[in-house]
């Protein structure tokens, strides 16, 4: 089989990753999922676009296909339809937990190289949301860059930049006004040819304006943002990959714009987002310390003496509690093990918030 050498490589295909895939020798062709529309998907192969439907075996397996997937397809001669025979291994995979109290998680997107976290420096500004997004990126395996937008609407952009910098650690940060095309184009320095980027951010953060600037036209419609509260809606409902004129692949996926994203992860990954807590935890008396009411807790001591800010501490406890709740929902044994610790965490968090309110 001849290897793709132009179209698919522009969409990020790396032949070396899949050379060992035996099905490539069975008359199948690689392609990438550009968009998913219910029972079929739009797939790009070296010869152009196809409409993909699942094979019977793949449908029976229960696997779901998402925008960004690399797949192996079997063409139907003389037809725009093709049969998706296999979903290739994902190098990164973005999920969120199912709504409500349902078990499991929803696949959102795959094979993302870079997550751009977009946050407005107006009423959209929230350091705590940045922490949540950094954790989501850590779990997905993708790299992340933070883009602080609307600096022209902020009275103290430098102070907010420094506040986010203390949270972000080594994560790159750009501060722009998306209405200034020159400033928006600075984002391109983070996007290599063939690499896939996508966005995280709440409605009204300026994602649509940035997307249109990067794509060189009004691909995504935008609604006005209310002056009173800074809110707005990104009106796209499609999930699709676009080639950037400068190289790279842009994914606009409405399923990953929400603030409440949360899914699989580990306590170790959470501590990577809160490194000061990980350091202080080394001083804890107990290895399974929940950093609440246990005696000789290094984290609580660090909060009391100012080495860890209360805001960061409460944010960590909140995310840790969510993580435990997700794990317990999906693992009955884990639920039994975590039940007592969860009660202690809730009680301690309420007490600390109450004590803080009295000061």
Curated annotation (Swiss-Prot):
NCBIfam families: ribosome small subunit-dependent GTPase A. GO terms for biological process: ribosomal small subunit biogenesis. Its cofactor is Zn(2+). The gene is rsgA. SUPFAM superfamilies: P-loop containing nucleoside triphosphate hydrolases. This is Small ribosomal subunit biogenesis GTPase RsgA. It is found in: Cytoplasm. InterPro entries: G_CP_dom, P-loop_NTPase, Ribosome_biogen_GTPase_RsgA, RsgA_GTPase_dom. It comes from Leptospira interrogans serogroup Icterohaemorrhagiae serovar Lai (strain 56601). Monomer. Associates with 30S ribosomal subunit, binds 16S rRNA. Binds 1 zinc ion per subunit. Residues 101-259 form the CP-type G domain.
């Amino acid at each position: 089989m001849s290897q793709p050498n132009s179209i698919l490589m522009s969409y990020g295909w790396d032949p070396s990753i899949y050379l060992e895939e035996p099905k490539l020798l069975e008359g199948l062709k690689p392609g990438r999922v550009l968009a998913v529309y219910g029972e079929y998907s739009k797939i790009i192969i070296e010869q152009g676009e196809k409409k993909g439907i699942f094979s019977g075996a793949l449908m029976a397996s229960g696997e779901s296909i998402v925008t960004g997937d690399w797949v192996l397809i079997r063409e139907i001669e003389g037809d725009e339809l093709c049969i998706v025979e296999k979903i290739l291994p994902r190098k990164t995979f973005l999920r969120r937990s199912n709504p409500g109290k349902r078990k499991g998680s929803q696949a959102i997107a795959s094979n993302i190289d870079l997550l751009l976290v977009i946050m407005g420096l107006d009423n959209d500004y929230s350091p705590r949301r940045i922490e949540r997004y950094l954790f989501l990126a850590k779990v997905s395996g993708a790299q992340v860059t933070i883009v602080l937008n609307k600096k022209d609407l902020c009275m103290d952009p430098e102070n907010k930049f420094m506040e986010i910098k203390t949270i972000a650690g080594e994560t790159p940060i750009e501060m722009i006004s998306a209405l200034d095309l020159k400033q928006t184009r600075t984002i391109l320095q983070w996007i290599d040819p063939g690499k896939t980027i996508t966005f995280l951010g709440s409605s009204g953060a300026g994602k649509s304006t940035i997307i249109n600037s990067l794509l060189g036209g009004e691909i995504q419609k935008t609604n006005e943002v209310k002056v009173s509260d800074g809110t707005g809606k990104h009106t796209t409902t499609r999930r699709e990959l676009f080639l950037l004129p400068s190289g790279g692949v842009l994914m606009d996926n409405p399923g990953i714009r929400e603030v409440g994203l949360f899914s699989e992860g580990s306590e170790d990954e959470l501590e990577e987002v809160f490194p000061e807590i990980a350091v202080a935890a080394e001083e804890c008396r107990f290895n399974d310390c929940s950093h609440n009411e246990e005696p000789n807790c290094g984290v609580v001591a660090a909060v009391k003496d100012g080495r860890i800010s209360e805001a960061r501490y409460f944010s960590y406890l909140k995310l840790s509690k969510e993580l435990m709740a997700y794990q317990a929902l999906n693992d009955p044994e884990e639920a039994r093990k975590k039940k007592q610790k969860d009660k202690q965490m809730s009680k301690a968090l309420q007490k600390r918030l109450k004590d803080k309110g009295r000061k």
